[in-house]
Amino acid sequence: MISNCGYLAFFLRAIPHSFFIFATRRKQLNLTDKKIAIIGLGYVGLPLAVEFGKKYTTLGFDISQNRIDELLKGKDSTLEVEPADLKLADKLSFSTNLEDIKKCTVYIITVPTPIDKNKRPDLTPLEKSSESISKVLK
């Protein structure tokens, strides 16, 4: 169990009937004084990080340094987000350094969960990202 994790959310992609798992210690979630971490900056994570980053302090985390470098230059090679929207997200920062997520209080994991021919999800990316996060939150 992650003891100092205030909020934790997982978005499981590529699973039929998208699953959303959310655990919270409070009934209402006021994000004004929170720092949000979006883990995984693909087609789900980046647009989410940009929208949160327009209003709330948000850290976009990805394991790919190339991905972070392009986003820091205001470019998105996947074309999920327009350069103008990236500029509007003035409370959004990017990093590949796991230590940077220590200061976050809300964690949203948006990593791939591809399905096999039997429509079973491969949860390996989710498991690995969760393990990585747990190391810095101890």
Where are these regions (language model features)?
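Ala/Thr-enriched low-complexity intrinsically disordered regions
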Residues: 9, 14, 23-24
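Structural/interface elements that position substrates and couple domains in central-metabolism enzymes
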Residues: 21, 25-138
